[in-house]
Amino acid sequence: MPADPEVHFEGTIVAIRGGVVDVAFAEAVPRIHALIVAGGVAMEVASIVGEGVVRCIALGPTRGLGLGTRATGTRAGIEVPVGEGVLGRMLDMFGAPLDGAPPPEATARRPIHRPPPVLSDRVLRAEVLETGIKAIDLLSPIERGGKTGLFGGAGVGKTVLLSELIHNTVEHHHGVSLFCGIGERSREAEELWREMGEAGVRERMVMLFGQMNEAPGVRFLVGHSALTMAEYFRDDREQDVLLLIDNIFRFVQAGSEVSGLLGRMPSRVGYQPTLATELAALQERIASTRRGAITSIQAVYVPADDFTDPAAAHIFSHLSASVVLSRKRASEGLYPAVDPLASTSVMLTPEVVGQRHYDIARGVRRTLAEYEDLRDIIAMLGIEELSAHDRAVVARARRLERFLTQPFFTVGAAAGTLGKLVPIAETLDGCEEILSQTSFERPESAYYMIGALSDLRKEAAA
């Protein structure tokens, strides 16, 4: 039954515990997810803790609130503006402007908590979203209408890789793009806003932020706000949506903070007992329907590089493609630091990408896996002790590792190089040529930070 926003509730604050506030109502009490306002601070009802008392998550600083402060609310929950008016804007989780411009002109407002599409309305699209990044397109192709995770610890290049994916895909994406920043640095938000303006793609993009200085309730709910806007463009406008999230782990982290403040008993490694439920409530809304598709690319911080961490493990289970970033490769300067053996995708099948792509990807993985097995022997005895066959494997593997590096547009100014966008056909041609050779004219350093193999020939001709 839809909420009746005309029903008003009045109560008083009876307890404040950090970001959690208890409010007592003399008569009827608001329902779960209802919006309560006290002293100018917005709060969302999280649970009913006793007769006439609700426990709320504060969505702003609780300074200035005190016992007995008057609180008001309705049956309505938090709503955000939807429509063409939000395009080209930088907003917070309520849809309020962060870009210094007037509030967006929206034709409607919708609640942020919505059910996922019903099973009968979902569709599977066996289509690949080409990114122009060799390592991803070859070994972990992104599903159009699917969910892709960029996994890695601190400092291995998740945000840079996500920025490059935005640069390469948003410009060629024919629908709407939506960026959701959860618990990351405010500096990165400003940089991304400026870069999107310089690239000329801001007018077809919405940017929502709940950054690390915000209350845990904001960081926990901003993802739902972003999905409500994305669902409008998918369902009402029948457009494809590209949803980029940085960082989905911060959503889990905010949920853990909120859970602790609500007094719930923590589960394994200190995470909230409702981790799986909360993550599913967000991820299941990211889906393809008969009217349109939401393609999601999510950066995932992995605490202490531990991929068995419950948060990382639960996020893995929702994804159609996992791009794993390796600290070892990053330390060797092999950027993007995509781990070719750990990264996976359900799209990497002959039926979807074609037999040739599938065979080349398998050949690349097999060669790199053999090289990994030989590393210890090389370290102890030297490469001279290997057989001719094994030396050829090492030569191919080391050139493949360097060929899969790539200069990025988004760090071109800092690195002093021009970015390269490589079509998948040229990536396949280059890998196939390297795999077929047993001896090489050029040193392995020549393959480092190039685009296609044709770039080598152009340099040689010049």
Curated annotation (Swiss-Prot):
Q: Name one GO cellular component term.
A: plasma membrane
Reaction catalysed by this chain? Answer: ATP + H2O + 4 H(+)(in) = ADP + phosphate + 5 H(+)(out)
Asked whether the UniProt record includes ATP-binding among its keywords, one would answer yes
Membrane topology is: Peripheral membrane protein
Could you tell me the keywords of this UniProt record? ATP synthesis, ATP-binding, Cell inner membrane, Cell membrane, CF(1), Hydrogen ion transport, Ion transport, Membrane, Nucleotide-binding, Translocase, Transport
What would be an example GO MF term here? ATP hydrolysis activity
Kindly list the positions annotated as binding ATP: G152, G153, A154, G155, V156, G157, K158, T159
- InterPro entries under this entry? AAA+_ATPase, ATP-synt_VA_C, ATP_synth_F1_bsu, ATPase_a/bsu_AS, ATPase_alpha/beta_chains, ATPase_F1/V1/A1_a/bsu_N, ATPase_F1/V1/A1_a/bsu_N_sf, ATPase_F1/V1/A1_a/bsu_nucl-bd
Q: What is its main location?
A: membrane
Which SMART domains does this UniProt record tie to the protein?
AAA
List locations, semicolon-separated. Answer: Cell inner membrane
Q: Which residues form a coiled coil?
A: none
Q: Which HAMAP family match?
A: ATP_synth_beta_bact
Instruction: State the NCBIfam families in the record.
Output: atpD
The family classification in the record reads: Belongs to the ATPase alpha/beta chains family.
Q: What does this protein do?
A: Produces ATP from ADP in the presence of a proton gradient across the membrane. The catalytic sites are hosted primarily by the beta subunits.
Task: Provide the protein name.
Answer: ATP synthase subunit beta 1
Recall the taxonomic lineage recorded for the source organism: Bacteria, Pseudomonadati, Pseudomonadota, Alphaproteobacteria, Rhodobacterales
